[in-house]
Amino acid sequence: MKTPAWSRLAGYAWGVLLWNVLVALFGAYVRATGSGAGCGAHWPTCNGEVIPRAPQVETLIEFTHRATSGLAFLSVLALFLWALRAFPKGHPARFGAGLALFFMVTESLVGASLVLFGWTADNVSRERAVVQMVHLANTYFLLAALALTAWWASGGGPLRLRGQGAVGLALFLGLLALLFLGMSGAVTALGDLLFPVGSTLEALERSLTPGEHFLVRLRVLHPLIAVSVGLYVVFAGYLVAHLRPSPLTRRLAQGLAYLYGAQLLAGLINVALKAPVWMQILHLLLAYAVWLLFVFLATSALERGAKRVELGEGGEAVHRGTGGATWRDYLALTKPRVISLLLFTALFGALIAAKGWPGLGVFLAVALGGYMMAGAANAINMVVDRDIDARMKRTAKRPTVTQRVSSRDALLFAFALAVLGFAVLWWGANLLAATLALMGLIWYVLVYTLYLKRRTWHNIVIGGAAGAFPPLVGWAAVTGELSLFAWYLFALIFFWTPVHFWALALMIQDDYRAVGVPMLPVVLGERATVIQIALYALLTALISLMPLLLGELGLLYLAASLLLNALLLLKSLALYRRPERRTAVSLYKYSMLYLALLFAAMAVDRAV
């Protein structure tokens, strides 16, 4: 039962958290203004004095930071002592306060080491960069401990860490990713201070110049890391909100998405304005806010008694799994037949970009990493859709339906694949390729599976964009950038997808109708569907000719595309005239051959 004393302590705990955020921001101001050496190499004294006399501006700034940090230390110590007295033994708030005191001690020691070893002002050593990252990580841990203490003091329940399956893994990876992002941001901010640039273009050129200082070369990675982490954090947030569906987790996940969007916007403005001090502080404040919001999301989702959707309505035993799953069952989770065409467009995207052979390492990275990322998306899709899959003949034998693989194990498998796939693409190709693959996964799971599929017949048009990412991955793996031609490949698949999938939807419309999925034939009927297919087939044919106008492809591709498009339009016309299963099957099968041969023709044309 919550007592008035506990309420007062909770209010104090929230105040201590806020104070420490402000102190940390002021510490960033000290670094950004180059005032870290304002007290010389002395600590805890300032230039050998307890209170500096006739100080310079830099000395005043550094001394003020030390004074406010001292107050922060005392406030955390008081919080710890108060928690010991107010809460009974075993209460999580006592643990949180003790953890906060520990990280406050280490925070002070790391800050002292920066001063005592001279890693301030204009120092450009690797040691300073490493300690700067450690300092940032420790600050994150300190704020998290204070946030947990305030949460528990306010009546939040204890956490259940065991048996959380993929939710626990997703949250752990999210915290790890945000920590990594913050550390990369600390190094980038240090580079902005020590190696200022006149423009964004100059920053990019210098970061790609061999022999430049490591702080300069690392600068270009932070934006890509920010996008990658942002995609994952938003994905993890909404997935956790789906699997732990309380009003609070939903609000936190939604707030996290908006807040991270604001953080990315602030980062872009920071780059455009060449990192002024005030913008650096705002950017860091948003980073702290994102971190704390994710901590609260994790705490809410992992509380004892939280509803666990992945276990099903019938209780834990319903989707526990029957045991005896083989490697074939896990392979089936990835939908290898579906992936084959996605992988083909990714690999041929690499061949098209390279105008020939891209190299064995890149080719294998795209093949293996691409398969893992797509397989992860498909496995998550099987878990989310297992209720309707059980009622459709085409999907009734999937491992998540037959329960040969439990929902928990399927999600763990999916997250493992996603992490490994991202790592393979980053290591074997580059971060841009890995980020694009992650974007495709998130689009398929969040936009298509979780949001659009059961809401609107536009699900295929919008959600189908997920299938257009593979050629971007292949292209980026080779070139490290996305040209206009790469986006043309994206557009081609985007407009081709409705032709392909609506033909399938016509074939199995009774299944979709039975489970209430609003595919186009179910909502508007066969006539409207075949008209839409014909229109998208015409758009696909027109888009396929665009590279010829841009001078990117030659006569070989022209001949192949004319033949392939003629057949596509003829089969679409045949379906329009006779909207029956036989013509739908014919178009469905040909659409796959069409896309594969069109990409092959591009690759051959650019190679010869």
From Swiss-Prot:
InterPro entries recorded: COX15/CtaA_fam (IPR003780), Protohaem_IX_farnesylTrfase (IPR006369), UbiA_prenyltransferase (IPR000537), UbiA_sf (IPR044878)
Miscellaneous comment text of the record: Carbon 2 of the heme B porphyrin ring is defined according to the Fischer nomenclature. Protoheme IX farnesyltransferase subfamily.
Entry EC number(s): 2.5.1.141
GO molecular function: oxidoreductase activity, acting on NAD(P)H, heme protein as acceptor; protoheme IX farnesyltransferase activity
Family: In the N-terminal section; belongs to the COX15/CtaA family.
Cellular localization per UniProt: Cell inner membrane
Leading EC class: transferase
Biological processes per GO annotation: heme A biosynthetic process; heme O biosynthetic process
Biological classification of the source: Bacteria, Thermotogati, Deinococcota, Deinococci, Thermales
Protein name from the UniProt record: Protoheme IX farnesyltransferase
GO cellular component terms given for this protein: plasma membrane
Gene this chain is encoded by: ctaB
Organism annotation: Thermus thermophilus (strain ATCC BAA-163 / DSM 7039 / HB27)
Pfam families xrefs: COX15-CtaA, UbiA
